[in-house]
Amino acid sequence: MRADTYYMLSFASTHQAIAAQRRFKDLVPVCVMPTLRAVQAGCGISLRVEEQDTGKLKAALSQGLEEGWRLFRIRGGAPDAIRVEDL
């Protein structure tokens, strides 16, 4: 069963989403998911990271990604844009 709270990374392009998935492969478990409708930006593809992997996500993001991504905390289906520092 999936948790009610998780993190979602949305991307400006499909290329960026796929590149991030590859980059995170050995750093943090991610699942490809459609971007939530409540998030009105991006290419439509996002990466989901479970709440228990927050530390791994923060470490992976500290290594840098191309520009054009946004981070959201999803609680009960509602997205809140956050910064990496807020993890």
Kindly give the residue locations of the regions a language model identified.
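Residue-level marker of intrinsically disordered, low-complexity segments enriched
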Residues: 16, 26, 31, 72, ...
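Amphipathic, hydrophobic secondary-structure cores in small proteins
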Residues: 8, 14, 22-63
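NTP/phosphate- and nucleic-acid-binding module
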Residues: 19
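Short glycine-/aliphatic-rich beta-strand segments at the starts of folded cytosolic domains
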Residues: 1-10
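C-terminal structural segments of small proteins and small subunits
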Residues: 55-87
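Arginine residue identity/basic-tract feature
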Residues: 2, 22-23, 37, 48, ...
